[in-house]
Amino acid sequence: MKYVSTRGSAPALDFAGVTLAGLASDGGLYVPEEWPQFTAGEIAGMRGLPYADLAARIMQPFVGDSLDPHRLLELTRQAYGRFAHAAVTPLTQLDEQQWLLELFHGPTLAFKDVALQLLGLLFEE
């Protein structure tokens, strides 16, 4: 998987490159050159997966050859295993039409844990 800049003049990079680079050298954002597609069967097969396993499955096409799929799964399990709730980000029904996604079960009790616990581990790779 290659990533290209939204401004068009930075070199295309793989997942490892964009993870370390952050913003593109031309000031743009890196986006996938092509968006991965999941079939209805693949999506159905993800139903009921633990959060960490689901995260790894969805991320794998974006990661491509930058990281072995088994290693990605280990990292997602390590990152989200630190959360205080088994569902990681439980969805709680408040009433008939309102739901609340709880993003505060990470180690710092902040929404940013959902992304940054894994990102720190990816930097170490």
Give the residues covered by each predicted segment.
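PLP-dependent amino-acid enzyme catalytic core
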Residues: 1-125
